[in-house]
Amino acid sequence: MNTRKWKFKQSRSIKVQVTNSKGKFMGKIIKELNNQNIKLNITAVYNAKQTEKILKILNKKIKVIISIFAGRAGDTGKDPVPEFSKSIKLAKRFKNVEILWASVREPYNYLQAKQLGCHIITIPPSIIEKIKKFGKSFDQLTQETVNVFLIDSKKSNFKI
């Protein structure tokens, strides 16, 4: 990487993958940008080992976001919560580091992230709409479901 200083507005950040397409840790680039006091969003992170490698090379001055892909991890049948828990504990030593819950798949992920003390969670609009339903009782859900069944049965024009 060219070691010249980048002219960069402090209100912006650069997104850098944790590894390149060959699986090599991008530590050299992360460290160089971080040492130039450029805010970073380090992305495509999946586990606490990757978080630890990142933290070992950071200065404690400039803001860094570590984006852990919870939904994609869950898609493999693995629970992302233990990795988040470990990563958040590791990051507590750094006031400038925030952990981001990326790749939200379901509304419950919001509660998981909140319970763990995750700093940031990116939530798509479709999930936000579902979060608005939080607090409904199972009885309310039963009645809503039965009403949908009734509407569907009327649309089918079946006679019983």
Regions found by a protein language model. Give the residues of each.
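A charged N-terminal "starter" segment
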Residues: N2-Q10, Q143-T145, I151-K159
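Acidic (Asp/Glu)-rich catalytic clusters
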Residues: M1-K9, L55-I62
